[in-house]
Amino acid sequence: MTRDEIVAIFQKTGAMLSGHFRLTSGRHSNRYFQCALVLQHPDYSELLCRELAARFAGDGISVVIGPAMGGIIVSYEVARALGVRGLFAERENGVMTLRRGFSIEPGERVLVVEDVITTGGSVREVMEAVRKSGGTVAGAGVLVDRSNGAVDLGVRTEALLTAEVVSYAPEDCPFCKQGIPAVKPGSRKI
């Protein structure tokens, strides 16, 4: 798929939002990628995740895992495309954990996936959970990298769409200074 084809899917589904947003990282931005609006369409989910999976075909991946909430559908669809298990990690007492009977066997090659990264914090937390379980993080795949490639996860990282989106610390946010309320569209702490 070309970048233009991927952008067209995000535009068609209304997933590229403009306004004043408080991101999961705590930073503020005037742009937000609401991947749930894309992922609600099974055909688009399959298409995008199949493209992401293709970038890791032949890498010996045996498990795909993503953080709840944004990584659940991505994990499932990428795992389906690779013909492997798809798991998700959840926060328990503030720590990303494997729950619901999920496990990773020592030495399994694991692909960590997510819908959107800005700072990479959630992906790093999942990577740590994988390593604590004895798995080997073989790579990371994301639908959208808001850092435009600036985030270094320490493993090969593939993004379907990279975008340089300005974000601000809350104290430096021009929208806050104008008194414009921030919207928190993500899933953390709901």
UniProtKB/Swiss-Prot annotation:
<comment type="similarity">
    <text>Belongs to the purine/pyrimidine phosphoribosyltransferase family. PyrE subfamily.</text>
</comment>
<comment type="function">
    <text>Catalyzes the transfer of a ribosyl phosphate group from 5-phosphoribose 1-diphosphate to orotate, leading to the formation of orotidine monophosphate (OMP).</text>
</comment>
<feature type="binding site">
    <location>
        <position position="146"/>
    </location>
    <ligand>
        <name>orotate</name>
    </ligand>
</feature>
<dbReference type="GO" id="GO:0044205">
    <property type="term" value="P:'de novo' UMP biosynthetic process"/>
</dbReference>
<keyword id="KW-0460">Magnesium</keyword>
<dbReference type="GO" id="GO:0019856">
    <property type="term" value="P:pyrimidine nucleobase biosynthetic process"/>
</dbReference>
<dbReference type="GO" id="GO:0004588">
    <property type="term" value="F:orotate phosphoribosyltransferase activity"/>
</dbReference>
<dbReference type="InterPro" id="IPR006273">
    <property type="entry name" value="Orotate_PRibTrfase_bac"/>
</dbReference>
<protein>
    <recommendedName>
        <fullName>Orotate phosphoribosyltransferase</fullName>
        <ecNumber>2.4.2.10</ecNumber>
    </recommendedName>
</protein>
<feature type="binding site">
    <location>
        <begin position="114"/>
        <end position="122"/>
    </location>
    <ligand>
        <name>5-phospho-alpha-D-ribose 1-diphosphate</name>
    </ligand>
</feature>
<dbReference type="InterPro" id="IPR000836">
    <property type="entry name" value="PRibTrfase_dom"/>
</dbReference>
<dbReference type="InterPro" id="IPR029057">
    <property type="entry name" value="PRTase-like"/>
</dbReference>
<dbReference type="Pfam" id="PF00156">
    <property type="entry name" value="Pribosyltran"/>
</dbReference>
<feature type="binding site">
    <location>
        <position position="118"/>
    </location>
    <ligand>
        <name>orotate</name>
    </ligand>
</feature>
<comment type="subunit">
    <text>Homodimer.</text>
</comment>
<keyword id="KW-0665">Pyrimidine biosynthesis</keyword>
<dbReference type="InterPro" id="IPR023031">
    <property type="entry name" value="OPRT"/>
</dbReference>
<keyword id="KW-0328">Glycosyltransferase</keyword>
<dbReference type="GO" id="GO:0000287">
    <property type="term" value="F:magnesium ion binding"/>
</dbReference>
<comment type="pathway">
    <text>Pyrimidine metabolism; UMP biosynthesis via de novo pathway; UMP from orotate: step 1/2.</text>
</comment>
<keyword id="KW-0808">Transferase</keyword>
